[in-house]
Amino acid sequence: MSVFGRAVMSAAAVAVGICVAGAAQAQELKPWTKGGFETHQYRSVFAEMGYPQAEVDAKLEAIFQEVFHGPDKVYFEVGDDMAYMSDVKNFDARTEGMSYGMMVAVQLDKKEEFDRLFRWAKKYMQYQDGPMKGYFAWSLAPDGTIRGRGPASDGELYFVTALVFASNRWGNDGDFNYLQEAQFILNSSWEKDGTDGIKPFIDKENHLITFTPDGRGVGYTDPSYHIPAFYEVWARWANDGRADFYRACAAASREYLHKSIDPNTGLNPDTNNFDGSFIENAFFGRRMKPAFRFDSWRVPMNIALDYSWACADREWQTNYANTIQNFFYSKGIDTFVDQYNVDGTDVDFAMPAGQGELRGTGTRHSVGLVATVAAATLAADHAIAREFVQRLWDSQNKPYEDGYFDAYYDGLLRLFAFMHLSGHYRVIEPAK
């Protein structure tokens, strides 16, 4: 049976603080009061909106096929048993995309795609020995040539979680022992003591993920790297003897997010210090105010994930979801742009994206941000959340008016958001 044939718990199927109505009848959208770790159930917000679950599942499968196998795909097979995810506009394969692809694949029970991606990542990206042992080079050319040799910590975060889920879903008796692969990353990181400037990708003292585990990046972080519920997955199933540490990481990450997000706008900077204070950044010689840019788009969806799975910070996360949706609504639900200063003012300089003829400049109403703000509905409790969900349902990932097109980042964030709001982004527990 495919993952779409398994029980999806919509408000029409289970009541967790929500009134039951007909399966295709629109309902009031209200966040659940318990998370998937406890209930083993996941909302289908689209079903609550009145869409039949079969139609929702078919649309999700179509979006998966678009991203992985369609004319504008970002998943490319290599030989008989490997594949990579490409940030096409930057002409590379990144640990971000590789680990995202693996997470999508394990969530949707696509074992072939998962194994192909991990086989490529292990062969070309992962260091098997030396100071970087266990880590992954963050950027490679499609032929496997390393472009950026250092790790980016969010890649390791997603690799570990996806591998633990693969172990739980498929077992460890095939080509890979997924659990051992996850433990290899975690154990290798834990053993690092600063030799050659390489440290653990999660700071042992403050329990917060680093921007990078090498160079200057060990001294600060990125709000979009913070997904507290992932640490709770590790605490339950990584089986490496560090469960208490991971639980402390989850708590520290939630506390850090409280300090990092503007209470009036719901916005955060792309990077900041561990205490939540701003870092003064420069780009192309320009001094820039702390701004919500491309990395930051992920934060609304990450907080929605933590709410959906753990529901451990309900009051703050619901207030956050309402605040950030209110901010973008105030900018025009169909016209808000994808970069703002944290205080909500317009940026003086728009960060470009892509390279060469695929480069995009300026700001736009990006579908990736439309998607992640809609995903925040899992935690929101106000009426306008429905409008954001509707915009996601009606969205398409296609070239913008200026010709810019991002099949990779926009495409993957849109896919993740559909997974969340269809009830198909779950804690994957061990098979019983």
Language-model region placement:
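N-terminal secretory signal peptides that target proteins for export/translocation
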Residues: 1-6
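Aromatic-rich carbohydrate-recognition surfaces in CAZymes
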Residues: 91-101, 145-170
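Sec/Tat signal peptide C-region and signal peptidase I cleavage site
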Residues: 20-26
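A cross-kingdom marker for long, charged
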Residues: 306, 360-364, 372-383, 389-432
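Solenoid-repeat scaffolds in large eukaryotic assemblies
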Residues: 101, 113-114, 175, 182, ...
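Extended ligand-binding clefts on enzyme/binding-domain cores
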Residues: 27-62, 91-95, 130-135, 148-154, ...
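Internal amphipathic alpha-helical repeat/solenoid segments
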Residues: 45, 53-97, 105-127, 132-148
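Bacterial N-terminal signal peptides
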Residues: 10-19
